[in-house]
Amino acid sequence: MTTFTKLSEQEAPSLSVHPTRRISKINPNIYAGFTEHMGRCIYGGIYDPGNPLSDENGFRKDVLEALKELNIPVVRYPGGNFMATYHWIDGVGPKDQRPARPELAWLGTETNQFGTDEFLKWCEVLGTEPYFCLNFGTGTLDEALAWVEYCNGTRDTYYANLRRKNGREEPYNVKYWALGNETWGPWQVEQMTKEAYAHKAYQWAKALKLLDPSLVLVLCGQDGTASWDYYTLKQCLLPLNSPLSTSAVPLIDMHSIHLYTASSDHRANATAPLAAERAIEITSSLIDLARIENGVPADQLRPTICFDEWNVWDPIRAEGSKGAEECYTLSDALAVAVYLNVFVRKSKDLGMCCIAQSVNVISPLMTTKDGITKQTTWWPLYLFSRYMRGWTISAHLSCSTYEGETSPKWVRGVKDTPWLDVSATLGEDGYVNLAVVNVHDDKGIETQLEGPSGEVSVFTVTGDNVNVTNMKGKQEVGIVESTWDGKGKYVFPKHSFTLLRWKA
C-alpha cells in the first residue's frame, strides 16, 4: 500500500518506507505466466522438436532456463481465444493419430502435436503449476469433466485409465481451472450474454466441484469495471446448496479480469497501467457487494481476483492474426514496472496475475532458431519476481503529477498520476525492497528518502531514450547494479525503473 500527497512542481518530493507496517502477504502467483496456441508461443517457442537447442521432449532448453530465472509459480494454458474451439482429447495419445484441425481464433491450423501431457510435462521440467482454461465455446460439460478426470483421476475410471494408457500412472493434480475465456467478446466463437454465461458457469462449477472439490475455479470476468462483472458475480457467488458442501468452501474461488494498455505517447503509455489499479479496486468492491446481497456466510472464503491477462499490447502494430510479436521499448518496460507496482500495492485482493504471454507472443522473451532475446520488459519482470515478494508494506510518496492525457482517457478522472510510481515489500529474508518508476522523460527526480539505515543495493533499468529496444541486435536496456549509502536524497534517473534493497 502506497499513500500519496500531491505536490506542486516547485515543492520537494519525499518518500518514506515503513517496514513495521505490514499490509498483506503477497501471493507468489502474481508472477504467473501464460502460454497460448497462438503465433510462435508453443510451436517454435516452448516446443521446437528437431532444433539442436531442444531436449529429448522437444522443449527449448534455452527458453526453460530463461523462464526458470523468473521463478514462475503458475502457467495458464492453452488459451486465450484459442480455447473456444479446442478439444483436449485431440491432443493426447500417439502423435501420429492426433488430428490436425482448423484453428478459428487466430486463423491457423492446430496440429495437436503439443497437448495436455506435453504441457504438463513441460510444467514439471520448469517447476511450475498448470492453470487450464475450459472450452466454453464449442465444448461441453461432459468434455470438461472428462479433462479433469484425465488429469486428476485416481480411480479405475475411463479417462483416468486413458491417462495411464498414455504413459502417466500418477495423477497430475491440476488445481486451477478457468470457466471459459472472454466469453463476452464479439470475437469469440459462441459469444455469450452475461445471463447465459452466468447460468452455464454456475452449473458447470457445481459439477466440477462434485467431481473434485479441491479444484480452484475461476469465473470469467471482463475488465473489472463492466456490468458483466457485477452480474456474473451476483449470480455465481451464492451459498452452496449441495449435500457434499460446507459453508466454508466457495463454488467460485477467483474472478478473472483482463487489461491491455498501449499508447504512442510515452507518458500516457507508462501511466496507463494505473487503470489496472482502479479495475482491481472496483472488482474487489463488486465481490463484496455480491456476497452482501446474496447473504453469503462470513466464514465462506472470499474470492480473489485473477488478473490472468495483462501487458502492453498495441494490436495494430502487433496483429494477433500475424503472431502478435511486439518489439518493446524502454517506455513499455516502465509500463510493465507500473503494472507490477500495482499488483504489489493491491496484493490483498489478488490470487493470480498472468503476463500475456510467456514466449514470442506479446512477450518479454523472443526466440529464433539460434537463440533467445530478452526484451526491455524482461528486466522489470525479473527484478520484481526475484525480490518483490513477502509482504506489502506501507510507504508514503509526496511529489508532483503528470497532468497530460491518459490512456485510457477515463484514468484522468479517477486516479492521480504521480511522476514517481512506488511499491514496497518486506521479504522473508528481512530485506526491504522499494520499487520506483520515474515516468518523467526529461528529468531525474531528487527525492528525500526516509527508511534506509545503512548501505543500499541499487538496481536500475533505463536507456538512452524511451524508444530504445533490445530487438535490433544490441541490448540497449538491462540492469545496472550499484550501491548507495542510504543517506539523504536519492535521484531517480529520468525514464527509469529503480529497485532499492536494504536490511530492515
Swiss-Prot record:
Q: Report the coiled-coil segments.
A: none
Could you tell me where this protein is found in the cell? Secreted
Return one Gene Ontology term, BP aspect.
Answer: L-arabinose metabolic process
Pathway in which this enzyme or protein is active = Glycan metabolism; L-arabinan degradation
Gene Ontology CC entries for this record: extracellular region
Q: Which residues are glycosylated?
A: N152, N181, N269, N467
Q: Which InterPro entries match?
A: Alpha-L-AF_C, Glyco_hydro_b, Glycoside_hydrolase_SF
Catalysis performed (reactions): Hydrolysis of terminal non-reducing alpha-L-arabinofuranoside residues in alpha-L-arabinosides
- Which EC number(s) does UniProt give? 3.2.1.55
Enzyme class of the recorded protein, top EC level: hydrolase
According to the UniProt entry, its GO molecular function terms are:
alpha-L-arabinofuranosidase activity
Recite the UniProt keywords alphabetically: Carbohydrate metabolism, Glycoprotein, Glycosidase, Hydrolase, Polysaccharide degradation, Secreted, Signal
This molecule's function is given as: Alpha-L-arabinofuranosidase involved in the degradation of arabinoxylan, a major component of plant hemicellulose. Acts only on small linear 1,5-alpha-linked L-arabinofuranosyl oligosaccharides.
Family as reported in the entry's similarity comment: Belongs to the glycosyl hydrolase 51 family.
Protein name per its UniProtKB record = Probable alpha-L-arabinofuranosidase C
The gene is abfC
